[in-house]
């Protein structure tokens, strides 16, 4: 797991939590929760890959791991669309930078999850 990705997650979550987007703060809190969930999922997949013999254990723990993987990719696509939308409507440069970095992070995480999942298949 790339330490830069971990610090990027922490940095973006911290900055997003400080933003006040008026009536859409509830949406932002939902995005933050999704980011945190995605980070945990990515970390657990990465750990499973590190143990490499853990596919059997992963399948036993969650017989529907492929379905869960598909749901995570849907969440990533949803988050990408939400971040793009927020980026389009915000005029604050601090928020724009944060959303651009969040978008880059989502693309990186999507690629990492794809790589991990191919190694597990």
UniProtKB/Swiss-Prot annotation:
Keywords: Host nucleus, Host-virus interaction, Transport, Virion. SUPFAM superfamilies: Nonstructural protein ns2, Nep, M1-binding domain. Its main location: virion. Gene3D superfamilies: 1.10.287.230, S15/NS1, RNA-binding. It comes from the Viruses. It is found in: Virion; Host nucleus. Belongs to the influenza viruses NEP family. Interacts with protein M1. May interact with host nucleoporin RAB/HRB and exportin XPO1/CRM1. This is Nuclear export protein. It comes from Influenza A virus (strain A/Leningrad/134/17/1957 H2N2).
């Amino acid at each position: 797991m790339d330490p830069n990705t971990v610090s990027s997650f922490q940095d973006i979550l911290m900055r997003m939590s400080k933003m006040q987007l008026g009536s859409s703060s509830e949406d932002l809190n939902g995005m933050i929760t999704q980011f945190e969930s995605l980070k945990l999922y990515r970390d657990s997949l990465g750990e499973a890959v590190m143990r490499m013999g853990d596919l059997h254990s992963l399948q036993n723990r969650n017989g529907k791991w492929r379905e869960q993987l598909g749901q995570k990719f849907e969440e990533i696509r949803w988050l990408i669309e939400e971040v793009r939308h927020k980026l389009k409507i915000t005029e604050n440069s601090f928020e724009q930078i944060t959303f651009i970095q969040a978008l880059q992070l989502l693309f990186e995480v999507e690629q990492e999850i794809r790589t991990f999942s191919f190694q597990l298949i």
